[in-house]
């Protein structure tokens, strides 16, 4: 019985981005990272990050540094929906503006290479109710309340 319990210990899959694990990604330069990214992200990094993107990275670094050990860092709010998620951003909390409110997003390793805007939906998904009068030809026979 004791042997069975020892075998049930869960092992988690180690994260890799295109065959490179997270520790190696953090040590890479932007030029080496660009080789792993898709064409759109390569083009964006090749053209360079602007001042706003650099200030976001600076604020994220500061929030991570000021956070107590083993706790999540402070949320950093931003309107930069077009910011590409870089490996150094992993573990940060970002408030991404959706046009109305800031949606809190915790950056996970699986998000590397995606845009911040992909994780903050800008519209409210439709919740369809019952069809009204004139919705279809058969709806003429639906009794009114």
Curated annotation (Swiss-Prot):
Subunit structure comment from the entry: Component of the small ribosomal subunit.
N-acetylalanine, modified sites: 2
Pfam families: Ribosomal_S19
Gene Ontology molecular functions: MDM2/MDM4 family protein binding; RNA binding; structural constituent of ribosome; ubiquitin ligase inhibitor activity
UniProt crosslink position (Glycyl lysine isopeptide (Lys-Gly) (interchain with G-Cter in SUMO2)): 108
Keyword field: Acetylation, Cytoplasm, Isopeptide bond, Ribonucleoprotein, Ribosomal protein, Ubl conjugation
Free-text function comment from the UniProt entry: Component of the small ribosomal subunit. The ribosome is a large ribonucleoprotein complex responsible for the synthesis of proteins in the cell.
Domain of life: Eukaryota
Organism taxonomic ancestry: Eukaryota, Metazoa, Chordata, Craniata, Vertebrata
GO biological-process terms attached to the record: positive regulation of signal transduction by p53 class mediator; ribosomal small subunit assembly; ribosomal small subunit export from nucleus; rRNA processing; translation
GO cellular component, one term: cytosolic small ribosomal subunit
Entry protein name: Small ribosomal subunit protein uS19
Family of this protein: Belongs to the universal ribosomal protein uS19 family.
Subcellular location: Cytoplasm
Keyword check for Cytoplasm: yes
Signal sequence annotation: none
Chief place of localization: cytoplasm
Organism of provenance: Bos taurus
């Amino acid at each position: 019985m004791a042997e069975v319990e020892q075998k049930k210990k869960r092992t988690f899959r180690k994260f890799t981005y295109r065959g490179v694990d997270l520790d190696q990604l953090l040590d890479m330069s932007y030029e080496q990272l660009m080789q792993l990214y898709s064409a759109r992200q390569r083009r964006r990094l090749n053209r360079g990050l602007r001042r706003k993107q650099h200030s976001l990275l600076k604020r994220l670094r500061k929030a991570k540094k000021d956070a107590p050990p083993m706790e999540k860092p402070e949320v950093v709010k931003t309107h930069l929906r077009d910011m590409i998620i870089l490996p150094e951003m992993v573990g940060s909390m970002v408030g991404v503006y959706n046009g109305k409110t800031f949606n809190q997003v915790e950056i996970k390793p699986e998000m590397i290479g995606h845009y911040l805007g992909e994780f903050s939906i800008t519209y409210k998904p439709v919740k369809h109710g019952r069809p009204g009068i004139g919705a279809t030809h058969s709806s003429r026979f639906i009794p009114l309340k």
